[in-house]
Amino acid sequence: MKRKIIVGSRRSKLALTQSNWVINKLKEQYPEFDFEIKEIVTKGDRILDVTLSKVGGKGLFVSEVEQALSNSTIDFAVHSMKDVPSSLEEGLVIGAIPKRESPLDCFVFNQVSSLDDLPKGAIVGTSSLRRAAQLLKHRPDFNIRPIRGNIDTRLQKLHVENFDAIILAKAGLARMGWLENTTLKLEDIAPEVCLPAVGQGALAIECRESDQLIRDMLATIHHEETGICVEAERVFLKKLNGGCEIPIAGFATKIGEQIHFKGLVGNADGSKILESKEIGENPGQIGNKVAEVLLSEGAETIIEELRNK
């Protein structure tokens, strides 16, 4: 009889698609195992009428899943990396980070087809303070309005609630097959306009530190370059003690042996944005260095002001 591996996942279409993608990759290597998904509802899934920045706290989409891991209800969990706090629960580790999808944010337009064509005062939907702050720096005339829900729900709201545009992660659109939908008016947002969230486009597969069988299994789908880049980003996030209530962005790429990392902290209306870049070979050192530069330039004051609102 085959051993069954229980995989923890949120129950959104995107989360289940991502979990099934991981399972199919593992089945190629381990046909002797059966895999079963256990759907878990998180705090972030239950609270849909409030923006995440107002809910506060860390791990809004992972805490209940980590609890299931800690009490051995599941064997591993599949998360979107950008949802995973910079510090994990004791006894848990990231067992693998597969190859990253696009890290970029993406405009989905209602009528026009490019950022430059959006009219003055355009209504743009996003509940991300990171996206809002950077867009307002670029276009202070924008009217940013919160929008929650899964990808399908947000795409419906684009028209029903008369947004001029909404912003989604391109990776989610890709995984759900929406990039092939020719009826959508899409445009990538350059990192110079909107730097991605830490870990955006990457998956995090979390397991128990003590479960060597699962760790060995997950190691077969780990992508080293993605892991190195995400490490730099997450070290940066941890140093700043960031969460979804702070406009923080961080994005690393690897060119040859060099890691190129840019980090950003801003206030909610985009009137003050601090940025720093670093190049080097050690991801942890680079992430720390960029965070230290931003802290020396006043990032701590921005973060405290936002937390005390």
From Swiss-Prot:
The porphobilinogen subunits are added to the dipyrromethane group. Its EC number is 2.5.1.61. One of its GO terms (molecular function) is hydroxymethylbilane synthase activity. SUPFAM superfamilies: Periplasmic binding protein-like II (SSF53850), Porphobilinogen deaminase (hydroxymethylbilane synthase), C-terminal domain (SSF54782). This is Porphobilinogen deaminase. The keyword Transferase applies. Belongs to the HMBS family. Pathway: Porphyrin-containing compound metabolism; protoporphyrin-IX biosynthesis; coproporphyrinogen-III from 5-aminolevulinate: step 2/4. One of its GO terms (biological process) is protoporphyrinogen IX biosynthetic process. Tetrapolymerization of the monopyrrole PBG into the hydroxymethylbilane pre-uroporphyrinogen in several discrete steps. NCBIfam families: hemC. Binds 1 dipyrromethane group covalently. PROSITE patterns: PORPHOBILINOGEN_DEAM. The keyword Cell membrane does not apply. Monomer. The modification S-(dipyrrolylmethanemethyl)cysteine is found at C244. One of its GO terms (cellular component) is cytoplasm. Its cofactor is dipyrromethane. It catalyses: 4 porphobilinogen + H2O = hydroxymethylbilane + 4 NH4(+). Keywords: Porphyrin biosynthesis, Transferase.
